[in-house]
Amino acid sequence: MVLLAFQNTNGGLPTSMRREAGDIRDIWSRFTTGVAVITTIEGGPDVAAGGSSELSPLTSVHGMTANALCSVSLDPPLLLLSVGVGRRSKKLIEDKNRFGVNFLNTMQLDVAVNFSTSDPRLHQSKGLDYWYTELGTPMIAGSLAYIDCRVVNHFEVADHVIFIAEAEQFELGRGEPLVYYERGYTGLDRRDD
């Protein structure tokens, strides 16, 4: 048995524990998550609906790679999405009051990388295949799973906005999940032990 001893400070935290931004990023990099792209419509108001793949000339699909989301409730089906206050996606989600969640599979690494930057000039959504839900939300074809969400509440916390959304439509796709760990993308190494 190994015992670890820490010397406490006034706040009760071990002296070896720091609270610097870089340190907390390192901690969170060890938390393995799935990878999703959050999709919204930019422009409008006329969008494709009912599975059509045609957008009005005044609209385009906007995406943001995310792993800061989680299930909140199963009945009703609610989820939580955290978006930085300076992100373009934040404004688009607030404006449209809905968004799509596309869980990516291992064959969609390029999609994850494409939408992982906050610089919209680097997004290449035109070459990707999309389909649209009955409610007009864009979804990335070939994803592992899809959720069409309607925002029911949102609030600002520090440098992020927390969106609580109801999953109004959802569908399973196929493939193996793309995973994010230590600031990199990978797949699962499934072993039959």
What are these regions (language model features)?
Residues V2-D193:
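Basic, polyanion-binding surface patches
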